A protein has these predicted regions:
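Structured, active/binding-site neighborhoods that engage oxygen-rich ligands
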Residues: 1-262
Length: 262
């Protein structure tokens, strides 16, 4: 995202995903690519183009990795172009696109200074646009229905009851129609206590690490670094060999350049 100015080169992305998995396997971390991403890379290796390699990818991989695009690209049509380019290689289905559009829009809204309530509304609007992209796929209407319910439902649900809500209404599996609404439910329920919301999401079962990653992206965008304790940041940076502040600054520079060109 940083190297390309917000618009991802799909073949470069494919190569970097494959290289990353090789590095993880070499470090003893096992196979970490999701099923949709793996099938897409196999399709590319077999000669299929990026417009068709992800036509069965309906899981949450695109939504999970889309936050940097939301940071780098301001709200508007250009954001949707960037999200589609970042997603279709592996997740070119309506349900996966809707999920990725939702998370990216929520993050972009938050980075622009908006709060959590506005981020959820931005996510709903973007998901409806994303649902028109990619191959029509089962679960799309269910994802939209669950997202539309969130503002009204969460107004009646206490933070202590959000786990029950997620288990009963959204689910937490790797399919987009469960994990994306679950992530946004945790983010909205947490309010200003981003750390509590993130810990609840990470304890939800199912694909909870991905749910927490998406929730954390939205919370961080809307609340800033103060949402999470410094020791948590330090642990993530140490374990992953990354300086999150530098990455954030570089993504912010991309966003500023794009805003200057509008």
């Amino acid at each position: 995202v940083i190297r390309s100015g917000g618009i991802i080169d799909e073949f470069a992305l494919a190569g970097r995903l494959a290289d990353w998995e090789d590095e993880m396997v070499a470090q003893g971390s096992g196979e970490l690519l999701g099923p949709s991403t793996r099938r897409a890379l196999e399709a590319l290796a077999a000669g299929f183009g990026p417009e068709s390699s992800g036509r069965t990818g309906a899981t949450n991989g695109a939504a999970m990795r889309i936050a940097p695009v939301g940071i780098a690209v301001p709200p508007g049509p250009a954001l949707f172009v960037a999200v589609e380019r970042a997603s279709r290689l592996t997740h070119n289905t309506s349900v996966a696109m809707a999920g990725a559009f939702a998370v990216a829009a929520a993050v972009s809204h938050g980075v622009g200074g908006g709060g959590l309530a506005g981020a959820i509304q931005a996510a709903i609007t973007a998901a409806e646009i994303g649902a028109e992209r990619g191959q029509p796929f089962v679960g799309t209407s269910l994802l939209l229905k669950r997202l539309r319910r969130l503002p009204g439902d969460l107004a009646k649900v206490s933070p202590s009851s959000v786990m029950d809500y997620v288990n009963d209404v959204t689910g937490t599996s790797m399919v987009s129609e469960e994990s994306v609404p679950a992530a946004l439910a945790f983010a909205l329920a947490g309010g200003t206590d981003g750390w509590l919301a993130l810990r609840m999401a990470a304890s939800a079962g199912g694909d909870c690490d991905t749910v927490a990653a998406m929730a954390g992206a939205v919370l961080g965008a809307c609340l800033g670094m103060k949402a999470f304790p410094e020791e948590a940041w330090s642990l993530v940076e140490a374990r992953n060999g990354i300086d999150l502040a530098i990455v954030g600054e570089e993504l912010a520079h991309v966003r500023a350049a794009r805003e200057a060109d509008r």
